[in-house]
């Protein structure tokens, strides 16, 4: 079975979705699976090609801009490129960009990370989520969800989507490959570590309030690592 990994929607090598896709690829590589091709944005091509030299890696460059004509040109470019790549399964690690919604549904496996776009976005981005989340789930052959919570959220939000399409596969991390450098940490003693983007829906404020209640009862320091957001500087600090 030939799998086409569609990373064309990832334009930064250390973006969360890119990292997720590359971890999946690393798992296939470690288990000796060979029938894989990778389609990736020109901006991450070198990174992906160097990381996985054993897999054919095809570069695709999109026009910049968000006007309708640009989006249409990019979709046609993507469609023609994918059509010319032999594959049995198209693996898509994220709903956006939703080019795959107009691909053959019997070939597409989608990863749905959550439905937070329905709750945190406004305006055009919110309407895009409202339209493409259910369309993507309807058009794909199968969907991977990263937790049972997400699976139940999908079932409640879109009861018309068959639960047989939704397959829970948790995110994985190879712990043995993580470097152990405790002596270089700026924090001494015990600590609680939070790593994620500092967005409001991540509930960092609740974490801070909870730690504030416990800080005099436990010996731990709270360490927070993440990309700063306006809510962080406005409320937390």
Each predicted region: which residue ranges?
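Carbohydrate transferase catalytic cores enriched for Leloir-type hexosyltransferases
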Residues: 1-237
């Amino acid at each position: 079975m030939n799998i086409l990994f569609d990373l064309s929607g990832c334009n930064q090598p250390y973006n969360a979705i890119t990292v997720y896709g590359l971890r999946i690829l690393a798992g296939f590589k470690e288990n000796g699976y060979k029938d894989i091709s990778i389609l990736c944005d020109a901006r991450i091509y070198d990174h992906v090609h160097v990381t996985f030299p054993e897999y054919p890696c095809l570069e695709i460059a999109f026009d910049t801009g968000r006007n309708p004509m640009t989006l249409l040109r990019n979709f046609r470019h993507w469609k023609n490129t994918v059509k010319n790549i032999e594959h049995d399964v198209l693996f898509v690690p994220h709903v956006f960009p939703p080019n795959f919604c107009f691909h053959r549904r019997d070939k597409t496996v989608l990863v749905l990370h959550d439905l937070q776009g329905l709750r945190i976005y406004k305006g055009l981005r919110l309407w895009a989520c409202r339209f493409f989340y259910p369309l993507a789930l309807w058009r794909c052959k199968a969907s991977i969800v990263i937790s049972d919570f997400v699976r139940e959220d999908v079932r409640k939000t879109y009861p018309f989507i068959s639960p047989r399409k939704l397959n829970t596969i948790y995110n994985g991390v190879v712990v043995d490959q993580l470097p152990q450098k405790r002596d270089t940490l700026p924090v001494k003693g015990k600590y609680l570590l939070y790593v994620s983007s500092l967005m409001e829906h991540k509930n960092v404020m609740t974490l801070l309030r909870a730690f504030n209640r416990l800080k005099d009862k436990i010996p731990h320091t709270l360490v927070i690592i993440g990309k700063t957001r306006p809510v962080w500087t406005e409320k937390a600090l």
